[in-house]
């Protein structure tokens, strides 16, 4: 038996045994004991893949994103995987097994460097430490916290891992295709798990509360259909249209209005790429008119609770359930009140509006907050608690608080440039086979960034999801440019009248070919 085949059999058997042990621990709820097993399992799988170890960067995060693994979900899985793969790749490079390159794209590289450098300057201006290393000083307690700085370090590791490993366009599409398949499998598994644990589909729960077992399946289906097919292709196909409508209902049943906003932004973005934006706009107007008609006829009361809550954000649509409308209005007023506090200097929640207060928090203030909670004067759901801890439920306000207007300006410019190149590279890939899998991987940047600005945006989301997707988009731009598919941004062409061009063509055709 050849050595390579024997090695593959041994590693496969070890992976099977470890997978069985991991499944047993997960079913018993022993998530803490599951961590070392997962690490050993991942190490063997890393050795098995060899030069293809970079596949794990794309294929592992969807598993942890959809699976409910308690303790493991609190870890920055994507950054950990990137760090492990980067170290392993560099070791193979030192031993001469692989090569190292730089998947560079100057505009995005420069802006990413500026963004991360500004976060570093924020830490220098507002240093923080870990709580276990703090001590009482004459001026009070030290500033602690700043998890966002560790997330920024993770971003650098992920950025280097994606940039240093040679990746071709064909291999990238292949890996992203398998990543999508893994996401579909995990979505179906989690949907089945939610239904089994809940005793099947519960009409009572769907009519009285937010219902989310179908969200993963609906989201994956909707994203793929709009990435693969143009709007007219969906409308003219009955099964595609039914699948899109069913996906929208599954997403709406969660009751989160930002989920529907994410769907709308994603659909409009892909329709722009497919050059059918006007068709989608007309379709949305028709759907809006139909919803207004149903509202006037009092025919929306039979919809699930979550769907009715989502429709409270649609102009012209009236929901009869006062509990739903009252809760939605209270949610908006609750946020607006906190944002008013944040932008009022006399409230004292933000000290430096220009450069920001950094990501730390005074231990003295944390101590006061803890005492207030213990005495029953404050709870974790109070506005004052969120304001004291810097949780503003708005990416814009959070950016101003932590990095100031200067940091917010840098983030806005960075996001706009990323928007531009994501759309540009997507248009360049419009006729490439398998392009939909690239769309599925880079267009979440557009939707997540929009939600960061107008919804509960946090810097953890910015680092963990948004910056990671921006790094992947940069790699896609680099790979596409190396393949000569990226059109030049500025070209200088001298205008030549048509009559002269025809004369030149005739002369060149009549002249003998040069040897």
Description of each model-found segment:
Residues 7, 40-45, 153-165, 170-199, ...:
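Alpha-helical transmembrane segments of multi-pass inner-membrane proteins
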Residues 21-33, 50, 70-81, 212-215, ...:
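Helix-loop-helix junctions and helix-breaking kinks within/between transmembrane helices
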Residues 36-48, 84-98, 220-233, 406-429:
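Hydrophobic, aromatic-rich transmembrane alpha-helices
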Residues 45-149, 153, 233-236, 445-451:
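N-terminal hydrophobic segments of proteins, predominantly signal-anchor/transmembrane helices
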Residues 49-51, 93-111, 229-242, 275-278, ...:
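Membrane-interface helix-loop-helix junctions at transmembrane boundaries of multi-pass membrane enzymes
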Residues 197, 201, 329-333, 337-403, ...:
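Long extracytoplasmic/lumenal interhelical loops at the membrane interface
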Residues 249, 253-254, 274-326, 347-348:
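A membrane-periplasm/extracellular boundary helix in multi-pass inner-membrane enzymes
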Residues 390-394, 401-402, 414-455:
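Loop-to-helix entry and N-terminal half of a specific, functionally important transmembrane alpha helix
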């Amino acid at each position: 038996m050849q050595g390579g085949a024997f090695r593959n059999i041994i590693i496969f058997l070890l992976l099977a045994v470890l997978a069985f042990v991991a499944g047993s621990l997960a079913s018993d709820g022993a998530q803490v004991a599951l961590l070392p097993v997962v690490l050993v399992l991942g190490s063997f799988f890393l050795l098995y893949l060899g030069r293809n170890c970079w596949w794990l960067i794309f294929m592992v995060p969807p598993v942890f994103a959809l699976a409910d693994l308690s303790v493991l979900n609190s870890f920055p899985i994507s950054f950990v995987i990137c760090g492990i793969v980067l170290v392993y790749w560099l070791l193979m490079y030192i031993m001469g097994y692989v090569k190292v390159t730089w998947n560079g794209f100057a505009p995005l590289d420069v802006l990413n460097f500026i963004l991360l450098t500004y976060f570093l300057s924020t830490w220098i201006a507002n240093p923080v430490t870990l709580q276990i290393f703090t001590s009482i000083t004459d001026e009070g307690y030290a500033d602690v916290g700043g998890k966002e700085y560790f997330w920024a370090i993770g971003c650098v590791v992920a950025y280097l891992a994606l940039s240093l490993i040679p990746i071709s366009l064909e291999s990238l599409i292949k890996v992203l295709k398998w990543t999508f398949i893994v996401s579909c499998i995990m979505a179906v598994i989690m949907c089945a798990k939610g239904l089994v644990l809940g005793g099947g589909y519960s009409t009572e729960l769907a009519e009285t509360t937010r219902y989310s077992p179908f969200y993963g399946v609906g989201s994956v289906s909707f994203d793929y259909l709009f990435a693969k097919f143009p709007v007219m292709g969906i409308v003219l196909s009955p099964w595609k249209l039914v699948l899109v409508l069913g996906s929208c209902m599954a997403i709406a049943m969660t009751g989160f209005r930002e989920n529907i906003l994410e769907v709308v932004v994603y659909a409009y973005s892909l329709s722009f790429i497919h050059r059918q934006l006007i068709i989608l706009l007309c379709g949305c107007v028709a759907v809006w008119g139909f919803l207004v008609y149903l509202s006037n006829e009092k025919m929306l009361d039979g919809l699930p609770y979550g769907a009715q809550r989502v429709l409270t954000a649609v102009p012209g649509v009236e929901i009869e359930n006062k509990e739903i409308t009252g809760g939605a209005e209270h949610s908006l007023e609750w946020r607006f009140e906190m944002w008013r506090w944040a932008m009022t200097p006399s409230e004292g929640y933000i000290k430096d509006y220009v450069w920001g207060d950094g990501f730390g928090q005074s231990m003295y203030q944390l101590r006061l907050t803890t005492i207030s909670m213990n005495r029953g004067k404050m709870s974790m759901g109070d506005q004052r608690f969120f304001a004291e801890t810097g949780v503003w439920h708005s990416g814009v306000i959070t950016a101003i608080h932590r990095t100031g207007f200067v940091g917010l300006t840098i983030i806005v410019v960075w996001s706009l440039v990323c928007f531009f190149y994501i759309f540009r590279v997507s248009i360049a890939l419009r006729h490439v086979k398998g392009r939909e899998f690239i769309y599925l991987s880079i267009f979440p940047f557009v939707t997540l960034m929009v939600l960061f600005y107008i919804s509960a945006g946090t810097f953890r989301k910015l680092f963990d999801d948004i910056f990671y997707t921006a790094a992947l988009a940069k790699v896609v731009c680099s790979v596409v440019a190396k393949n000569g598919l990226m059109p030049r941004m500025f070209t200088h062409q001298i205008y030549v009248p048509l009559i002269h061009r025809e004369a030149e063509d005739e002369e060149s055709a009549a002249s003998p070919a040069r040897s």
